[in-house]
């Protein structure tokens, strides 16, 4: 040994005690998400989960996502409570479009210096998202990495696994000309297009917190948590033969709808069937954004699109409305003529 002072992990910027304090803070909210299939508790090297016994030929479906630069806006405005809901929503909504019931969720939280209060607020939001979607928060990773992030900045990612009966997978193969398209309303921009949103705020000089929009502020509209459609869709699947579901995320209408359409089919969207929520009108006007670019970047008030047969339209609308969703007939499926796009917005 020399006379040099002894270094610790904390001296290097990693506070193990803070990490342990975070685990203690979140234990109770994580426990509230537990499903009967989950074996063991927090703290193991891996999480164990059985497949529900009701499935005869279960197929596992997995997904991972983040919340993009919506997180930057949330950090700038010190609003950390709902961003965890966004994280879960982006993952579980991708699973439900294939008919999968979310089983469990894991999160990754990375930061340069762990702020226990902020992290606890984020994880509490993640737990709330898990409760809304019926999946268990079975674990995660909190990485304190000095020098990797500026100040108290952090990043989050989510990972979800679900299950679907093989015979009930929704993959778009049933879609045919004549099918109806049903829209489910979004809660706002959800978690996509925020780099453009932040650029619009910068160019317009608008302060999100003090700019009024309807009965609240622009900030409230922009940071409204992403709507989770899982329970409504799982219920609908039991009652209606769903041909396809598209999650309107990054890439908007033009990119996401074709992902679930068979070749030689075309989605025809009636733009007169709904009014854009005021936040999208504000963004278009403040940023002088073309209508084509709006549909390419944002959901414009449509979180999901569902394809069903014309005979099931009224049943679908009635069921979704009973589940608390705002749903309407937005268009139909037609044969795709040579040279035409797969999505037409009239």
UniProtKB/Swiss-Prot annotation:
EC number: 6.3.3.1
Pathway: Purine metabolism; IMP biosynthesis via de novo pathway; 5-amino-1-(5-phospho-D-ribosyl)imidazole from N(2)-formyl-N(1)-(5-phospho-D-ribosyl)glycinamide: step 2/2
Coiled coil (residue ranges): none
Locations listed in the record: Cytoplasm
Statement: the UniProt record of this protein carries the keyword Cytoplasm: yes
One function term, GO molecular function aspect: phosphoribosylamine-glycine ligase activity
CDD domains according to UniProt: PurM (cd02196)
Reactions catalysed: 2-formamido-N(1)-(5-O-phospho-beta-D-ribosyl)acetamidine + ATP = 5-amino-1-(5-phospho-beta-D-ribosyl)imidazole + ADP + phosphate + H(+)
Cellular-component GO terms for this entry: cytosol
Pfam families per UniProt: AIRS, AIRS_C
Domain of life of the native organism: Bacteria
Gene Ontology biological process: 'de novo' IMP biosynthetic process; adenine biosynthetic process
Assigned keywords, A-Z: ATP-binding, Cytoplasm, Ligase, Nucleotide-binding, Purine biosynthesis
Annotated family: Belongs to the AIR synthase family.
PANTHER family: TRIFUNCTIONAL PURINE BIOSYNTHETIC PROTEIN ADENOSINE-3, TRIFUNCTIONAL PURINE BIOSYNTHETIC PROTEIN ADENOSINE-3-RELATED
Protein name (database record): Phosphoribosylformylglycinamidine cyclo-ligase
Source organism per UniProt: Proteus mirabilis (strain HI4320)
Lineage of the species this protein comes from: Bacteria, Pseudomonadati, Pseudomonadota, Gammaproteobacteria, Enterobacterales
Encoding gene (name): purM
């Amino acid at each position: 040994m020399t006379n040099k002072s002894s270094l610790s992990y904390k001296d290097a910027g990693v506070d193990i005690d803070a990490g342990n304090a975070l685990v203690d803070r979140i234990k109770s909210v994580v426990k509230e998400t537990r499903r009967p299939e989950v074996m063991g508790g927090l703290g193991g090297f891996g999480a164990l989960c059985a497949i529900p016994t009701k499935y005869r030929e279960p197929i596992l479906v997995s997904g991972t996502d983040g919340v993009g630069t919506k997180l930057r806006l949330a950090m700038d405005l010190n609003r950390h409570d709902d961003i965890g809901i966004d994280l879960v929503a982006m993952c579980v909504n991708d699973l439900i479009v294939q008919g999968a019931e979310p089983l469990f969720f894991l999160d990754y939280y990375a930061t340069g210096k762990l702020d226990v209060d902020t992290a606890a607020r984020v994880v509490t939001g993640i737990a709330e998202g898990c409760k809304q979607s019926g999946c268990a928060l079975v674990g995660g990773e909190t990485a304190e990495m000095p020098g990797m992030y500026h100040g108290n900045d952090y990043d989050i990612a989510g990972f979800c696994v679900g299950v679907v009966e093989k015979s009930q997978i929704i993959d778009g193969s049933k879609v045919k000309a004549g099918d109806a398209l049903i829209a489910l309303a979004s809660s706002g921009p959800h978690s996509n297009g925020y780099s453009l949103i932040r650029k619009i705020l910068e160019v317009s000089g608008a302060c999100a917190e003090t700019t009024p929009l309807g009965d609240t502020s622009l900030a409230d509209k922009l940071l409204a948590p992403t709507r989770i459609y899982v329970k409504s869709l799982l219920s609908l699947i039991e009652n209606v033969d769903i041909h396809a579901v598209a999650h309107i995320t990054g890439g908007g209408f033009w990119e996401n709808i074709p992902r679930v359409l068979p070749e030689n089919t075309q989605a025809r969207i009636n733009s007169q069937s709904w009014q854009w929520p005021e936040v999208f009108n504000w963004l278009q006007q403040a940023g002088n954004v073309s209508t084509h670019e709006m549909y390419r970047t944002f959901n414009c008030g449509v979180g999901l699109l569902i394809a069903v047969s014309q005979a099931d339209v009224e049943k679908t609308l009635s069921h979704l409305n009973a589940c608390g969703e705002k749903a309407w007939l937005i268009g139909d499926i037609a044969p795709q003529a040579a040279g035409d796009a797969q999505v037409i917005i009239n």
